């Protein structure tokens, strides 16, 4: 689909950058010659907009071998960022999709500045082409035909092989993020823990990864009482899923991802209200993020060792469901007093973290739609983060900045640890109260990471959006897929 050329050679549509400068760029000036000065007139009349994310369509009327030009407003060069570029190109590709364009090109060099080189632009363009045009996979009987972009040409004077490589990496990042989106959007009667495990196994087999899927009896043998407690009320069997990618000859410096895989969350006996329960099919967003990252890793084959662990079940009410006041024993041996059955994700993750360590993880990153508290604190754009190791956190932070998936660190103080350790009956309690709820959840998980370098990512606010946006429709976002993959790709770099 993606190709590289030095010159335009007849396309339905070409995407061109337009900055808010006193003079037209050399690329636009060259086009203006073919248009006999008409582009300059359109700019002066403000019919070509340079405002950020503005899309201006100009028909060539036979003046060039391109049918239409789509000028993408980027604002002033000094405020130009990768985030600006992603949003603007996302809108541009959605515009092309609405016009049913099948053959398009991008004048890559017109987007290059001192801040962003052609490789950056190529990566983002290919990534955003997938993200921006993603459509919800629905179960409607009346399905409309989708017109796909079949050919996309990057026009540049830069090295073709380097640009092709960047396009490939960007495309893989976008596609894997969309895979995660599709998982999160699936209804819970379709995506059970068993189906999630089957998906993970297919992924592992496709990319020649080792894998393990523990059944209930094996979990009992290993003492995974926290995950099993959450599963107690369900007719669906639990799964502890592990994918193992060996990118080095020696099994060392292993990065462990742990993704929350609660396929539906009613809250259990600490029952959610109706409005709080609808949408809880997305409570496995952490698992989807981890699987999306493993898809990228499988495609790009970085020289790193990676484990992905997903504790999966639903959390429902029944005569056998676990209850507030229960005391359970986790795989780590630590006992937990259950004060809230709707704080089930941290219980599943506790055993997931311990299992990842057992499999050899030297570094841990857990990802979970864990708390409403993080949404109150940070909103729907920023992922909450907590850590016991600043060096590892800095690497995660740098990866998130590269992918424009912002994270913000929340604290863990000794008094927070005292709150999760405050129980008359057990080593820990799973819900000390609403105050500092996001911090309490992360602090609880830190009790299981112990001395292993660990970062916790709470994506409750960022995993889904209520409305359409520049990088896709309402629904799942695929949050943290690209950040996790970029962390692996860059891990250990100075």
UniProtKB/Swiss-Prot annotation:
Catalytic activity from the UniProt record: Release of an N-terminal amino acid, Xaa-|-Yaa-, in which Xaa is preferably Leu, but may be other amino acids including Pro although not Arg or Lys, and Yaa may be Pro. Amino acid amides and methyl esters are also readily hydrolyzed, but rates on arylamides are exceedingly low; Release of an N-terminal amino acid, preferentially leucine, but not glutamic or aspartic acids
Listed EC numbers? 3.4.11.1, 3.4.11.10
Report if keyword Protease is assigned: yes
Q: Which residues bind Mn(2+) 2?
A: 260, 265, 283, 344
Cofactor note as given? Binds 2 manganese ions per subunit.
Co-factor(s) = Mn(2+)
- Which cell locations does it reside in? Cytoplasm
Q: Name one molecular function that GO assigns to this entry.
A: peptidase activity
UniProt entry keywords in alphabetical sequence: Aminopeptidase, Cytoplasm, Hydrolase, Manganese, Metal-binding, Protease
Concerning SUPFAM superfamilies, the annotation shows: Macro domain-like, Zn-dependent exopeptidases
Q: Which residues form the active site?
A: 272, 346
Top enzyme class, one word, equals hydrolase
Biological process GO annotation list?
Answer: proteolysis
Sorted alphabetically, the Gene Ontology cellular component annotations on this record are: cytoplasm
Q: Where does Mn(2+) 1 bind?
A: 265, 342, 344
Q: What family does this belong to?
A: Belongs to the peptidase M17 family.
Described function: Presumably involved in the processing and regular turnover of intracellular proteins. Catalyzes the removal of unsubstituted N-terminal amino acids from various peptides.
Name used for this protein in its record = Probable cytosol aminopeptidase
Q: What is the lineage of its organism?
A: Bacteria, Bacillati, Bacillota, Bacilli, Bacillales
């Amino acid at each position: 689909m993606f190709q590289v050329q030095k010159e335009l050679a007849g396309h339905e549509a070409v995407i061109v950058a337009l900055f808010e400068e006193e003079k037209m760029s050399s690329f636009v000036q060259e086009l203006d010659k073919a248009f006999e000065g008409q582009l300059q007139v359109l700019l002066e009349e403000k019919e070509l907009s340079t405002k950020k994310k503005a899309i201006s369509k100009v028909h060539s009327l036979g003046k060039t071998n391109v049918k239409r030009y789509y000028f993408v407003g980027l604002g002033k060069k000094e405020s130009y960022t990768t985030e600006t570029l992603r949003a603007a190109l996302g809108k541009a590709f959605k515009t092309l999709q609405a016009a049913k364009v099948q053959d398009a090109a991008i004048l890559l060099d017109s987007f290059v500045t001192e801040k962003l080189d052609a490789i950056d632009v190529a990566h983002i363009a290919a990534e955003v082409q997938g993200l921006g045009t993603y459509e919800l996979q629905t179960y409607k009987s009346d399905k409309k035909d989708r017109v796909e972009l079949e050919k996309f040409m990057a026009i540049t004077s830069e090295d073709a092989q380097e640009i092709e490589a960047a396009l490939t990496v960007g495309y893989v990042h976008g596609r894997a993020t969309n895979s995660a989106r599709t998982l999160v959007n699936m209804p819970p009667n379709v995506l059970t823990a068993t189906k999630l495990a089957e998906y993970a196994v297919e992924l592992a087999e496709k990319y020649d990864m080792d894998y393990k899927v523990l059944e209930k009896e094996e979990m009992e043998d290993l003492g995974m009482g926290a995950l099993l407690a959450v599963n107690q009320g369900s007719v669906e069997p639990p799964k502890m899923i592990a994918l193992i990618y060996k990118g080095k000859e020696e099994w060392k410096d292993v990065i462990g991802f742990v993704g929350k895989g609660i396929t539906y969350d009613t809250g259990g006996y600490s029952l959610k209200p109706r409005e709080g329960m609808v949408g809880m099919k997305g409570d496995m967003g952490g698992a989807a993020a981890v699987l999306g990252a493993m898809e990228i890793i499988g495609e790009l084959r970085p020289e790193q060792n990676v484990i992905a662990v997903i504790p999966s079940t639903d959390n429902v009410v029944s005569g056998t469901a676990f209850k507030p006041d229960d005391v359970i024993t986790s795989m780590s041996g630590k006992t937990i007093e259950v004060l809230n059955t709707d704080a089930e994700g941290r219980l599943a993750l506790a055993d997931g973290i311990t299992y990842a360590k057992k499999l050899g993880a030297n570094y841990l990153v857990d990802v979970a739609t864990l708390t409403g508290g993080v949404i109150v604190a940070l909103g729907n754009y920023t992922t909450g983060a907590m850590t016991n190791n600043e060096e590892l956190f800095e690497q995660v932070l740098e990866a998130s900045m590269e992918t424009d998936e912002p994270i913000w660190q929340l604290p863990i103080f000794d008094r927070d640890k005292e709150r999760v350790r405050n129980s008359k009956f057990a080593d820990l309690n799973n819900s000390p109260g609403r105050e500092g709820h996001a911090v309490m959840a992360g602090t609880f998980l830190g009790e299981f990471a112990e001395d292993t370098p660990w970062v916790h990512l709470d994506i409750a606010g960022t995993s889904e959006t209520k409305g359409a946006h520049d990088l896709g429709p309402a629904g799942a976002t695929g949050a943290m897929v690209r950040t996790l993959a970029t962390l692996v790709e860059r891990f250990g770099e100075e």
